[in-house]
């Protein structure tokens, strides 16, 4: 599809959603609202997910990981061809900000529901985006004009501009591949970790450096732009409540901004998008310092996780707007809308807030979302779903809306108390605590939360989760069965106890029934705080060992880096001593409680 208004633009007739979870459900429902048939795709672990069932058609991508499924260009384009879909919506994450995939979709003769590949390329490269922002006269803190070539350049920048500094993935976002250095000595390790995370998440490891604003707010502008040069800011959001630089709570409009700050954000966001020749839905992100200084952060060239709070306060369906823009239509709004009330979104992630938000994969044995006035739940799971470690940790999003911020907070307290999830740890206990925390509630002078507030100031009294069941991949063996539907050969995967039998109650050929592993309720093992063993605090993959056999360490030294749900997690020494008995190797998949090494 051409990216300019002067050419003839095809119209969407059938949408393939190249994603999973709650965003796939969200886009499928929008397609139904628009009268468009939808197509889902899925990896093997998602075969029974709600988005697969809700779509008009679903095609298996195969594979257990993102790389084998949702990141595979050929498989997704093949599913589009087989289904007859003429448009692809990427959701967010995965291939949503991949310019090469956007171009491949267009080259295949399909409609790409998103910005042009060139805009994605320019704004997705954080260094190029800074150049665009500078030309648009957006506010900016000092940073390297191009990616750095090594840790030495990072050290040189820190020595010139001072600490703290942020090392950031040049081709990513969402907190992945971002590390903050507060001392010169930690720069080499943090740079190496940022490069690893960036490579794993985005396929490219280049990083740039900029001065880090201490205790900033994260404020952003939701932009929608058509292919005729019209740009509107649908509203602002505050996303300051984060852990590991990934958002947990978002609200709209951004509270406690001056009229000048709000105007500067709206105006500069529009200038940046026009400078980049942007069309589609996008988000221009800023940091706001304690002194009120505003600094451009990045542009996310896709729909954001937190888009529902803007929908609730602006009265705009942003996914439907994406469809209309992709169809070549002009925006049906010409001015920035005035916010209607206040909305807050809470991400319901599979993480244990009582253990520093460690990823906590597991089965969802009960999912009971709240309802009532001013309550919306966007979910990608249901009772019986299994949250594995292959993908990110989000189960659902709770969105509350009120006449003002106070009413939204009151509804949030009620809805969070109603929200029931069993079987695995979630961040709901954190949300219940934060909506009553004076730092977040604020007063006439504003609130005191910032992007590092959770890690540095929040008093975490939440008990570690103990009521779940361990994830047992073998509990329900599956069998693939070939069936014909209207003459079309379809391969389906069924639980073995539901698969076809010979009519006498015997197991189907090739099905091996496994006795379920005994489950211990309440079992909970974290990283050792005493004794010699250094144990894995979570299920995940060993990325690297930072120590060698016989090496002397002191308490707090990095021992091993684990990866789970697309985030790296350091495991440190709990006491002084000598490393012995390195028990696993880099690349090994481990479970919570696995002994990684001992300190004698």
Swiss-Prot record:
Sites where the protein binds Mn(2+) 2: 298, 300
A Pfam family: Biotin_lipoyl
Pathway of action: Lipid metabolism; fatty acid biosynthesis; Lipid metabolism; mycolic acid biosynthesis
Signal peptide: none
GO cellular component terms, semicolon-separated: acetyl-CoA carboxylase complex; peptidoglycan-based cell wall; plasma membrane
CDD domains named among the record's database cross-references: biotinyl_domain
Name the UniProt record assigns to this protein: Biotin-dependent acyl-coenzyme A carboxylase alpha3 subunit
Recorded name of the encoding gene: accA3
